[in-house]
Amino acid sequence: MITISDGVSAGARQDDAGHVLADRLLVLGFEVDRASVPDERPAIEAALREGVVSHELVVTTGGTGLTPRDVTPQATLAVIDYEVPGLAEAIRAAGRAKTPMADLSRGVVGVRSRTLIVNVPGSPRAALESIEALVPTLHHALETLGGPFDHGAAGAGQEARPDLPNPEAPR
C-alpha cells in the first residue's frame, strides 16, 4: 500500500487513510506493506514498479483529485500494461452513491505483469468506501491474474487459489 502525500512522506502529517486501508486489507487476509511518497510522478512511478515485484495487489491512496500535484493517475498509467476500467467505474459509482464529489476522482485501476494496481482517494472515508466497492470482484480478479484459471469450472474460487485472501472476511 502506497500513500501519496507530500505531508505524510515528509512526516508532517498522519497517514489516516493509510491506517484505515491497512486495517481493512488485513481483515480481508492480505499481508500489508506500507510506503509513502511525495506527490511527484517519478517517485510514484518508482514506488509502483517496486511494489509489483513482490505483491499481487498494490493500492495507492491520494493524488487522484484535480489539483496540479494530483499526479497518481498519470504515474499509474505510465506503469501499467493495461487498464481495468470497470473496477475504477465501480469505485466511482460506490462513491457517487454517497456524494457527487466522487466523480472528481481520477483514480485508475490497471495491471502490470500479474499485479493489480488500484488508485483510491486520499480521504479515509473515500478510501475505505473504494476498497469496499471492490470486495465482490477483487478475489476473482487476483485469481485470474495469478495463473491458469478455468473460468468455466464449477466452484472455481478458493479451491483454485487457496493462497489468496478471502474477500468475504467480516468488516
Predicted regions and their residues:
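Non-catalytic beta/alpha edge segments that cap or flank active sites
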Residues: 2-171
